[in-house]
């Protein structure tokens, strides 16, 4: 079955089969599927490299212990019961599988449901999902999850549609209560088989459903194994019955009834009977079971419970009598019949003889206590069985559809699994027979599908041997030769009245089956070799269970009841003179199984094979032997081999091409599917470009087949790596984009905020200019364009600051203006002199703060405090002076007269707080120095004072300022059309490192790594480097001795410096440039001037002896640029310059280079003395060596000097171009 591509689920599912030519419908985009998470092991067992039962078991265990309970075999799902909630059934996970194919998602029961729903909707084919496995393996849970998924994805708007979906979901709790019970293997074991067929219209919307019931284990009503329980509904009803039922039906606790307490297990861990009873009642309400119908249902349950409490004792005539007559009296009330009729039906059996077609005599045969108990139990089982059938029919009635647009259906089969007990009887034979039929369908349909696909695709394959269990099915159901069911029917017909005789006759007829290799007969037992293992069945009582008929007197008792509901649920008794043999239980089972097989054969099947990991129901235990046995009898190995018979993987051309197109440059570009030819040729091109041998694949008519799973692994791995690379590129581009966007946004915000602040500052400044416009001469600095009114120049608004505490401000006091100022201090007999003060203005008060020494400590005190609301006016002169008079109408200490350099800002701020303040400008200023005493201050022009004023003898002397009509210049703006950096102009080069004595111009140094305590790798050293210091040359006595010109030559930089990290500029002395060194010319005859009589200068004094700063290399360091030195561990080098950045300039063999400071340590050995000259260094270092060694050292040093001089000249030549 091909993996389908979900292109458009909304389209009508009328698409034809895949085009054999594989012609593409235009360019399509390759989609990166990221929904599939990484898994452990292999999620498809067909991809196992080694196919054995042990390898299958190992892979399932590995996934089980990692919480991966689902695994594929192709399209077959293997489910291992986790016995815990893994959180894998949430609504988000459910939605993640909607519209996805198997390759796009991890194995899950939702994927099986999605595939079945899509196939049904797209191709109008009936689907069925067959869930098989042993009891406790999780079949019922899987069926519930499938119903949950399908009802969700098919949900549509409409009252009727929503009602149908709700009823379908409500059938689960209802049928679980009446059809499930606690067993030793499973706390919620299905004791019946159920086939739910969901019916959909052409739009894929559910319009109805039908439930078919199989094999209800009615024997559980009267008999349970120790530590098992009866059906859940009995415990729910007896624990949580409403009071009206307790009063009407006499309901008591479960411990008071034999049918519920004999097993000695009234409660189960993890099951709340009270809560489940409410769920059952809600389900009945949703389905539409009326309250009178509910009353009758619980009446039948009450009858069964009270029947179980009837006990018999032996009578005088050898018959039996009822021990407690009160129970039968209450049962007569519940059933609606006389008490005597109940006692007669339970203790007496009516037998009738027959002579051919004539009716014979009628006899009343008394029953002993054992026989009476059997009749009681038969009645109880019959009531419950008929009640269960009625509930199923009632649900079907609620789900019946009136929609004429019925299209297709999806069937979900949940039937209890293969059973092997210590004592196996007729019930286990029927259950195992049905499982054999399902196994037969699985094998035939799986093999048939594979065969048809290979034939259709013209692919040759080798058939795989497998066990065909048809022989086992024939052993049970065959008529000729007679099988087990036929032998039982013959035995019943021979000895109808006597069960023991019938069992004996059945045992004799089994001798005819002894030649069957799958059958063995033993004393009073027989063995059937099923596909799941050998099962030993007991013959005792098997024929009686096969008859499954109520006695005539019991049926007569039921139909004599005045309860119409009870009579309606029981079938009408057949006429006693009918010669036709009534069908036995085996006949009904065989008919139901064949009908089920016929229904399933008309559908496209999907399979879920459930596995139980342990018998303890523990979430942590994995019984390898137990699972291995299930793997074997489920035939998983054969299924894998059938799936891999020819090829482990097959896919349609278009899907394969679109999935793996990225692996070929001819079929895709940048992740886009660009192939213009047909899909088949695209697949061939992809396989060719990925170097897949032709022996590893074959091309069918519409699909590509890959032989080994390793080939698929290789393709998937290459595809993952491609998308990983693409994802990395996208992430890198996205991060770069986000960073640029963030930086741009930050720049815009910064500029906008600055512009916004500047606009506000400019507006306030212009307001002040307007306030004094045409009234007062202006100072030159007052109208500068860069002048801004910041206000709090003394940071008085800082909480707990000096001025804050001095003025006693609180959090609610906002400082608007603070400034240093001067006030006139009046002294007796002398002119007043300005004295410094601090001015603080808030929205409420104006403070004048004085600083003075108190007790030899410098302290601050509030000298004056004015309420802003009490200020009447402000006085100024009409000249450019800075004196201001603040007149306080309610002041007791006089006004303030002070000099404030930012007077315009101060007055503007004051005016904005109190609009009633008058600004008085004139040639004089009047203020009250003391209360009631007016002082007049005059002004006088003095051109000797240009930019300042002074006070003397009541007169302010000031020079002529700018005209009163002067306006403030506009704020400076950034250059239009240029960037911020361009507007600021070129950034000056920052010299980070000290200049050397005679620097040598080198190419711009690369960034260096920060020094580390331990050696780091090369990759680590390339990150976060600070700029390295420029290379500097050591003094060279040879060059220094040569005459130099006095002309300074500009040296061009040899390399281009990065804009983001400018290299430190170096200034090269003319003396260090070889091009500027004067070379002595050769002597020329007759043209050489005579030497001067002046004697030559004396030779220079010997250089001072300096001590070498030697260091020992701790680690190896490999230089990666020309200005870095390569050093080896334990090598001794000389450090000539240390930089705080962590890079030191080292000297070794006459060559210099930078090394990390953390890679070297101070050398503690003997330090030889040397001169500054490199030549003398070499000589003194080798003064104790042999002549040969001295010559070698001298030669090496000379070579090093020549190389260094050549390097210097080369560098200078590069800078001259």
Curated annotation (Swiss-Prot):
Residues bound to ATP: 17-24, 133-140
Disulfide bonding pattern of the chain: none
IQ domain ranges (all copies): 724-744, 745-770
Residue ranges constituting the TH1 domain according to the UniProt record: 778-964
SUPFAM superfamilies attached to this UniProt entry: P-loop containing nucleoside triphosphate hydrolases (SSF52540), SH3-domain (SSF50044)
Bias-annotated ranges (Polar residues): 1015-1025, 1076-1088
Residue positions, PTM Phosphoserine: 361, 742, 782, 1211
Chain intervals with Pro residues compositional bias: 1093-1103
Residue numbers spanned by region Disordered: 1-26, 961-1105
GO MF terms, alphabetically ordered: actin filament binding; Arp2/3 complex binding; ATP binding; ATP hydrolysis activity; lipid binding; microfilament motor activity; phospholipid binding
Domain SH3: 1106-1165
Pfam families per record: Myo1_CA, Myosin_head, Myosin_TH1, SH3_1
Membrane-spanning segments: none
Cell compartments where the protein resides: Cytoplasm, Cytoskeleton, Actin patch
Database matches in PANTHER family: MYOSIN, MYOSIN-3-RELATED
Entry's family note: Belongs to the TRAFAC class myosin-kinesin ATPase superfamily. Myosin family.
Protein name: Myosin-1
């Amino acid at each position: 079955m091909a993996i389908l591509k979900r292109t458009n689920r909304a389209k009508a599912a009328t698409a034809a089969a895949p085009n054999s030519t594989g012609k593409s419908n235009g360019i399509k985009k390759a989609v990166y599927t990221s929904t599939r998470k990484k898994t452990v092991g292999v999620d498809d067992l067909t991809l196992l490299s080694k196919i054995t039962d042990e390898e299958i078991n190992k892979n399932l265990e590995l996934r089980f212990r990692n919480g991966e309970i689902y695994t594929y075999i192709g399209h077959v799902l293997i489910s291992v019961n986790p016995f815990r909630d893994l959180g894998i059934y949430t609504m988000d996970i459910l939605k993640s599988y909607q519209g996805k194919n198997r390759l796009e998602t991890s194995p899950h029961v939702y994927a099986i449901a999605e595939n079945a729903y899509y196939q049904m909707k797209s191709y109008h084919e009936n689907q069925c999902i067959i869930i098989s496995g042993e009891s406790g393996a999780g079949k019922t849970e899987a069926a519930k999850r499938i119903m949950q998924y399908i009802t969700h994805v098919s949900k549509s708007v409409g009252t009727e549609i929503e009602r149908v979906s709700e009823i379908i979901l409500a059938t689960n709790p209802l049928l679980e209560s009446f059809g499930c019970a606690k067993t030793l293997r499973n706390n919620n074991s299905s004791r019946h088989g159920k086939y739910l067929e969901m019916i959909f219209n052409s739009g894929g919307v559910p319009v109805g459903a039908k439930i078919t019931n199989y094999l209800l284990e009615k024997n559980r009503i009267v008999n349970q194994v120790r530590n098992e329980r009866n059906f859940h509904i009995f415990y729910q009803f007896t624990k949580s019955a409403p009071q009206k039922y307790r009063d009407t039906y006499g309901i008591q606790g479960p411990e008071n009834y034999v049918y519920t307490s004999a097993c000695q297990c009234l409660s189960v861990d993890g099951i709340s009977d009270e809560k489940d009873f409410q769920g059952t009642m809600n389900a009945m309400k949703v389905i539409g079971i009326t309250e009178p119908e509910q009353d009758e249902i619980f009446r039948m349950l009450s009858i069964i419970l009270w029947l179980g409490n009837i006990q018999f004792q032996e009578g005088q005539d050898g018959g039996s009598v009822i021990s407690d007559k009160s129970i039968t009296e209450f049962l007569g009330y519940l059933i609606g019949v006389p008490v005597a009729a109940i006692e007669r039906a339970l203790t007496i059996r009516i037998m009738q003889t027959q002579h051919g077609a004539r009716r014979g005599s009628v006899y009343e045969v008394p029953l002993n206590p054992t026989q009476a108990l059997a009749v009681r139990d038969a009645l109880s089982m019959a009531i419950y069985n008929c009640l269960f059938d009625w509930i199923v029919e009632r649900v079907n009635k609620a789900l019946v559809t009136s929609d004429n647009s019925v299209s297709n259906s999806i069937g979900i089969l949940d039937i209890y699994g293969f059973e092997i007990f210590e004592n196996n009887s007729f019930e286990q034979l029927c259950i195992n027979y049905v499982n054999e039929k399902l196994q037969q369908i699985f094998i035939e349909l799986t093999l048939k599908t594979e065969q048809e696909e290979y034939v259709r695709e013209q692919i040759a394959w080798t058939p795989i041997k497998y066990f065909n269990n048809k022989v086992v099915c024939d052993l049970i159901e065959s008529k000729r030769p007679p099988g087990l069911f036929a032998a039982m029917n013959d035995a019943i017909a021979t000895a109808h009245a006597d069960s023991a005789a019938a069992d004996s006759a059945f045992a004799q007829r089994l001798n005819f089956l002894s030649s069957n290799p799958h059958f063995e007969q033993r004393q009073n037992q027989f063995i059937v070799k099923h596909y799941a293992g050998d099962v030993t069945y007991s013959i005792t009582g098997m024929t009686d269970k096969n008859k499954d008929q109520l006695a005539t007197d019991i049926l007569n008792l039921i139909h004599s009841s005045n309860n119409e509901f009870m009579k309606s649920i029981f079938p009408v008794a057949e006429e006693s003179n009918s010669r036709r043999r009534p069908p036995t239980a085996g006949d009904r089972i065989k008919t139901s199984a064949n009908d089920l097989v016929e229904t399933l054969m008309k559908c496209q099947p999907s399979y879920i094979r459930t596995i139980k990991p342990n018998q303890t129901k523990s979430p942590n235990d994995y019984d390898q032997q137990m699972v291995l046995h299930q793997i074997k009898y489920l035939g998983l190995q054969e299924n894998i081999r059938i799936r891999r018979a020819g090829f482990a993987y097959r896919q349609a051309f278009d899907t394969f091409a679109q999935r793996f197109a990225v692996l070929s440059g001819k079929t895709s570009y940048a992740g886009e599917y660009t192939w213009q030819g047909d899909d088949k040729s695209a697949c061939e091109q992809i396989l060719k470009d990925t170097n897949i041998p032709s022996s590893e694949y074959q091309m069918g008519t519409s699909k590509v087949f890959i032989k080994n799973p390793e080939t698929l692994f290789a393709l998937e791995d290459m595809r993952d790596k491609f998308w990983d690379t693409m994802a990395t590129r996208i992430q890198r581009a996205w991060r770069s984009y986000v960073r640029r966007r963030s930086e741009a946004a930050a720049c815009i915000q910064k500029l906008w905020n600055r512009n916004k602040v500047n606009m506000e500052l400019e507006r306030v400044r212009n307001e002040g200019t307007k306030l004094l416009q045409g009234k007062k001469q202006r100072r030159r600095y007052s109208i500068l364009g860069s002048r801004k009114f910041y206000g709090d120049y003394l940071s008085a608004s800082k909480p707990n600051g000096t001025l804050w505490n001095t003025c006693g401000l609180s959090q609610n006091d906002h400082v608007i203006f603070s400034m240093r100022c001067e006030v006139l201090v009046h002294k007796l007999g002398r002119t007043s002199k300005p004295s410094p003060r601090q001015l603080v203005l808030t929205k409420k008060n104006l403070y004048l703060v004085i600083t003075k020494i108190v007790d030899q400590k410098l302290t601050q005190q509030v000298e004056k405090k004015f309420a802003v609301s009490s200020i009447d006016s402000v006085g100024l002169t009409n000249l450019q002076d800075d004196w201001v008079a603040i007149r306080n109408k309610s002041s007791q200490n006089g006004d303030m007269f002070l000099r404030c350099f930012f007077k315009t800002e101060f007055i503007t701020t004051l005016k904005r707080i109190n609009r009633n303040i008058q600004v008085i400008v004139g040639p004089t200023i009047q203020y009250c120095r003391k209360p009631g005493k007016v002082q007049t201050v005059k002004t006088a022009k003095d051109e000797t004072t240009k930019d300042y004023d002074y006070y003397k003898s009541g007169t302010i002397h000031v020079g002529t300022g700018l005209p009163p009509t002067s306006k403030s210049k506009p704020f400076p703006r950034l250059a239009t059309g240029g960037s911020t950096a361009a507007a600021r102009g070129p950034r000056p080069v920052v010299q980070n490192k000290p200049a050397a004595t005679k620097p040598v111009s080198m190419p711009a140094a690369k960034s260096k790594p920060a020094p580390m305590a331990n050696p780091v790798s090369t990759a680590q050293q390339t990150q976060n480097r600070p700029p390295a210091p420029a290379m500097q040359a050591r003094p060279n006595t040879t060059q220094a001795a040569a005459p130099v010109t006095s002309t300074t030559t500009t040296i061009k930089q040899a390399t281009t410096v990065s804009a983001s990290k400018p290299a430190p500029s170096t200034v090269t002395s003319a003396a260090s440039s070889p091009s500027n060194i004067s070379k002595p010319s050769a002597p020329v005859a007759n043209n050489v001037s005579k030497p001067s009589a002046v004697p030559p200068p004396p030779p220079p004094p010997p250089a001072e002896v300096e001590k070498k700063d030697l260091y020992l290399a701790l680690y190896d360091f490999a230089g990666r640029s020309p200005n870095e030195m390569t050093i080896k561990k334990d090598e001794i080098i000389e450090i000539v310059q240390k930089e705080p950045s962590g890079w030191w300039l080292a000297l070794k063999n006459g060559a210099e280079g930078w090394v990390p400071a953390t890679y070297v340590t101070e050398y503690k050995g003997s330090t030889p003395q040397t001169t500054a000259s490199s030549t003398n260094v070499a000589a003194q270092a080798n003064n104790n060596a042999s002549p040969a060694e001295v010559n070698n050292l001298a030669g090496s040093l000379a070579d090093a000097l020549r190389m260094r001089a050549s390097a210097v000249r080369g560098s200078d030549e590069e800078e001259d171009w």
